[in-house]
A protein has these predicted regions:
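Basic, Lys/Arg-enriched alpha-helical interface segments
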Residues: 1-64, 72-77, 86-101
């Protein structure tokens, strides 16, 4: 899978250093993945939440951080839509959130 907007992850782990290794591991795993449907994601990440609009929520570092992505299965692309703490995640709508520029 190709990860789009991966550049948003670096500033996050620079301010949350304990998220760096878990996020880098997630990036490595996703780049090697070949997902064609939501069940492929669930097979690899049992704790991932599949939402409407091709959105998926991943727990990072246990449940300390949340990563929301949109998956374009046909194009083998994952778009980063949100990265934040669990508390920050509780304040957003994961089905519509977009990264701020």
């Amino acid at each position: 899978m190709r990860i789009i907007a991966i550049s948003y992850l670096r500033p996050f782990w620079e301010t949350n250093p304990d998220a760096e290794q878990p996020l880098k591991s997630w990036v490595d795993e996703v780049k090697k993945a070949n997902w064609s449907q939501p069940s492929d994601i669930k097979a690899q990440y049992r704790s991932a939440s599949i939402l409407k609009n091709r959105r998926v929520v991943f727990n990072i570092k246990g449940n300390d951080y949340r990563l929301v992505v949109s998956v374009a299965y046909r194009f083998q692309a994952v778009y980063v839509k949100f990265i934040g703490t669990h508390a920050e995640y509780d304040l957003i709508d994961a089905e519509t959130v977009e990264m701020e520029s």
